[in-house]
Amino acid sequence: LREIAFRTAGGGTGKAVDIDEFDTMENGCRQLIVWNPEDEEIIGGYRYLYGRDWRTDKNGQPVLATGHMFRFSQQFMRDYAPYTVELGRSFVSLDYQNVRGNTKSIFALDNLWDGLGALIVINPDCRYFFGKMTMYPSFSKRGRDMILYFLRKHFNDDDKLIVPMQPLEMVTPEEELA
């Protein structure tokens, strides 16, 4: 379902099944599924992995789907990783996306986020969510820059806990975003 949802938007893996080594490895990713019991349909889902289950490589870096994108500081690994959940591969099934113009879509994201809240209730030692998000090249650069500006202004990582290997540069002048 995730592959179908992303392929429709111009993304996806192109494979028949959207499974990788992080799904199949020992103590691999788990799946959060949001279910509509009335229609017996999957609304959406997230792939997740508890920090306490992360494996590390010979350099002390976590073996994660985001591992090729970021460097994780020793402080992060010591003080935050055990209480963090890596999120990825989120999706909303096509029938529950607002672009379809149907009423099924009204609570799809809310239900998905309620599921994330349930992870915290079930596992009270989890305090943080971490993950990446996809923005396709067709997404407005100005729109992307507005998101980057907001995140850097209000949630900047001054301690360099997690550092991107290839940081995104804003193309929109900052004074236009302030």
What are these regions (language model features)?
Residues 1-50:
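Short amphipathic alpha-helix that is part of the acyltransferase structural core
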Residues 51-178:
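Acyl-donor binding region in acyl/amide transferases
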